[in-house]
Curated annotation (Swiss-Prot):
It comes from Homo sapiens (Human). The keyword Transcription regulation applies. This is Interferon regulatory factor 4. The modification Phosphoserine is found at S447, S448. GO terms for biological process: chromatin remodeling; defense response to protozoan; immune system process; myeloid dendritic cell differentiation; negative regulation of toll-like receptor signaling pathway; positive regulation of cold-induced thermogenesis; positive regulation of DNA-templated transcription; positive regulation of interleukin-10 production. Transcriptional activator. Binds to the interferon-stimulated response element (ISRE) of the MHC class I promoter. Binds the immunoglobulin lambda light chain enhancer, together with PU.1. Probably plays a role in ISRE-targeted signal transduction mechanisms specific to lymphoid cells. Involved in CD8(+) dendritic cell differentiation by forming a complex with the BATF-JUNB heterodimer in immune cells, leading to recognition of AICE sequence (5'-TGAnTCA/GAAA-3'), an immune-specific regulatory element, followed by cooperative binding of BATF and IRF4 and activation of genes. The lineage of its organism: Eukaryota, Metazoa, Chordata, Craniata, Vertebrata.
Amino acid sequence: MNLEGGGRGGEFGMSAVSCGNGKLRQWLIDQIDSGKYPGLVWENEEKSIFRIPWKHAGKQDYNREEDAALFKAWALFKGKFREGIDKPDPPTWKTRLRCALNKSNDFEELVERSQLDISDPYKVYRIVPEGAKKGAKQLTLEDPQMSMSHPYTMTTPYPSLPAQQVHNYMMPPLDRSWRDYVPDQPHPEIPYQCPMTFGPRGHHWQGPACENGCQVTGTFYACAPPESQAPGVPTEPSIRSAEALAFSDCRLHICLYYREILVKELTTSSPEGCRISHGHTYDASNLDQVLFPYPEDNGQRKNIEKLLSHLERGVVLWMAPDGLYAKRLCQSRIYWDGPLALCNDRPNKLERDQTCKLFDTQQFLSELQAFAHHGRSLPRFQVTLCFGEEFPDPQRQRKLITAHVEPLLARQLYYFAQQNSGHFLRGYDLPEHISNPEDYHRSIRHSSIQE
């Protein structure tokens, strides 16, 4: 989906990819056992770990008939490719299988055993036993202050949560991955809408009365994935930590700059994230497309256009409950600065085709709490991406192409804390009237394609 400046417009649609009900699990086992695909082999006698070839289509020795055969077979199996009718698209085939593997709780990638920098690269996955799946975890919190008076049942997919009282907003972190918050089936199957209306999707909570007689209430408007659970079994709200409740909001506020001139500002809403790039959009991807505009005629136009020519596949950004992630797909070098950057005085590079965490939800909440209760500095939440030039660079501050990215809810919490200073305790209210409602009412097309 294309997003124009100001975040206006859009369309709603959905696709029907599904690897639920163990379909992908059994399909892959059958393919490995068939021996039809070179390099797709079991790694152990128990047949619980397997190797899958993962050659990039840009390699000189890439053979589409052989290297893309498995990905094509998955597309055929899912009805996403019709031989003789549809145009062959190996990168999309590969992406569909990758996303299906990542979203399924039947598989776990063994990153330390994968080899992606050799002539015949491959990934290694483990088949997760039924009893060890993340979706089957029963999570509990023993802190009585975090117990809720009324349990509720989370129904799929992505329901509106009823009003609840949350007695302690800044809950301690849990040892959970962001995948614990996503449904077992891949997102494209879900007729999902990121917040379209305010009232029904509000998560309301009320904190205890404070010593000064004040009481803070808050309402979150967020994309709230359900916990995996047995049908008909109520789920205690206390199993969701604060970051899961608050940062299931998938929206990102993005500003694009040429030199120091703002050329586009918008808010994304796709739960799969967005792609910042230039030129044509990728029809196979339903990520929110954030396109750098063609530069106006000025002294730096040629230099800017030269850098933009290398942004064709762009960089993908997405917000998970535990933080903001990025994956650089384009040829252009991308450098970044933000709260998780290792260096403040020298460049931090986004490596190509590698996932990088740019913002940590729990760290932000903890630092915000430290500001509220102990008077410490407000936490950072803005991430800056610099395209084609090293950054940060104290010797040369002005850059040709940059993007400023902010998780929307972090931005709102930050400004509320700043405005209320020491009176900030456990929550905030979203304003009832928002200046640009189009940013929050955008219909979306939804997909898991990131590559």
